[in-house]
């Protein structure tokens, strides 16, 4: 009885609510375009397929409940992922029906290439790459490194040879004179790639006669240079120009302070005398 009375009292309220719902639904249908409907359908289809293939907790790393063989799949290992999906190459995009599989093609093969898990160091030995190689191949080798000197060097300060091993000299005089004489008496292998000067060893290797000849040639060249006054500071360099003669017209000229004092050993090549 009470319900009938309330319905009889407010008949217009229900009518207004019904009209409002119809108006809003009509506005919503008109506002939808074909592009929006297509995007909505594609998103719904994608979520449905992902929900069908993926279980709850698939992306949760620390979830102990999702400890099944198909839940904790390494996303990097493509071959393992295909094996866990019963041989399928693309479990995410697979559909239950044949028409769905035809309408949703799998990803390209290049994106699913399985790389080898083997790794190691890579060495490059010269060359010009894939182009024509005009230079000889050079491979660095550590077999030619210089050996230790004979006798060996003194031990560093604080070095314990009994516990740390080695072949250095423990008892020695730690002075500059001893170090200079000791290094001069050592027989060391000289390496041109790791040492500054190997001239003494090269001259000793070529033989005594050729070593004396090289030293004689060097002395002759030095003597010729001294006779030609190449080391004379006061000598004029080639293309130095004529000596400057005093000019009476420059007596009243403004003196440049930067030209006073000692002249630096710098001369402008083919420079002209300019007066302002």
Curated annotation (Swiss-Prot):
Disulfide bond sites: 155-168
| Subcellular location, principal | secreted
Q: Where's it found, cell-wise? A: Secreted
Q: Membrane: is it a keyword of this entry?
A: no
Keywords (alphabetical) are: Chaperone, Disulfide bond, Secreted, Signal, Transport
Q: What InterPro entries does this protein map onto? A: Secretogranin_V (IPR007945)
Q: Which GO terms describe its molecular function?
A: enzyme regulator activity; peptidase activator activity
- The domain of life is Eukaryota
Question: Which GO terms fall under biological process for this protein?
Answer: neuropeptide signaling pathway; positive regulation of proteolysis; regulation of hormone secretion
Pfam families reported for this sequence: Secretogranin_V
* Function of the molecule: Acts as a molecular chaperone for neuroendocrine convertase amon/PC2, preventing its premature activation in the regulated secretory pathway. Binds to inactive amon in the endoplasmic reticulum and facilitates its transport from there to later compartments of the secretory pathway where it is proteolytically matured and activated. Also required for cleavage of amon.
Assembly notes: Interacts with amon/PC2 early in the secretory pathway. Dissociation occurs at later stages.
Which family does the similarity line name?
Belongs to the 7B2 family.
Report what the protein is called.
Neuroendocrine protein 7B2
Q: Which organism is it from?
A: Drosophila melanogaster (Fruit fly)
Q: What is the lineage of its organism?
A: Eukaryota, Metazoa, Ecdysozoa, Arthropoda, Hexapoda
Q: Which gene encodes it?
A: 7B2
């Amino acid at each position: 009885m009470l319900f009938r009375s309330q319905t009889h009292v407010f008949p217009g309220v229900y009518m207004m609510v019904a009209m409002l719902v119809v108006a809003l639904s009509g506005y919503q249908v008109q506002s939808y375009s074909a592009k929006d409907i297509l995007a909505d359908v594609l998103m719904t289809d994608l979520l449905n397929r992902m929900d069908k293939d993926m279980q709850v907790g698939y992306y949760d790393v620390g979830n102990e409940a999702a400890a099944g063989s198909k839940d904790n799949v390494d996303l990097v290992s493509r071959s393992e992922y295909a094996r866990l999906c019963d041989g399928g190459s693309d479990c995410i995009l697979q559909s239950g029906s044949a028409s769905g599989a035809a309408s949703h093609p799998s990803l390209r093969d290049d994106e699913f290439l399985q790389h080898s898990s083997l790794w190691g160091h890579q060495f490059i030995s010269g060359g010009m790459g894939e182009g024509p190689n005009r230079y000889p191949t050079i491979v660095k080798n550590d077999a030619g490194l210089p050996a230790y000197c004979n006798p060996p060097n003194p031990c560093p300060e604080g070095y314990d040879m009994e516990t740390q091993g080695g072949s250095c000299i423990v008892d020695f005089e730690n002075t500059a004179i001893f170090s200079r004489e000791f290094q001069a008496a050592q027989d060391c292998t000289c390496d041109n790639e790791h040492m500054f000067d190997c001239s003494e060893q090269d001259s000793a290797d070529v033989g005594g006669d050729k070593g004396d000849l090289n030293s004689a040639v060097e002395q002759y060249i030095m003597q010729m240079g001294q006779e030609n006054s190449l080391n004379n500071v006061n000598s004029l360099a080639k293309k130095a120009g004529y000596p400057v003669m005093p000019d009476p017209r420059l007596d009243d000229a403004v003196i440049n302070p930067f030209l006073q004092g000692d002249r630096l050993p710098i001369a402008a090549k083919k420079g002209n005398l300019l007066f302002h």
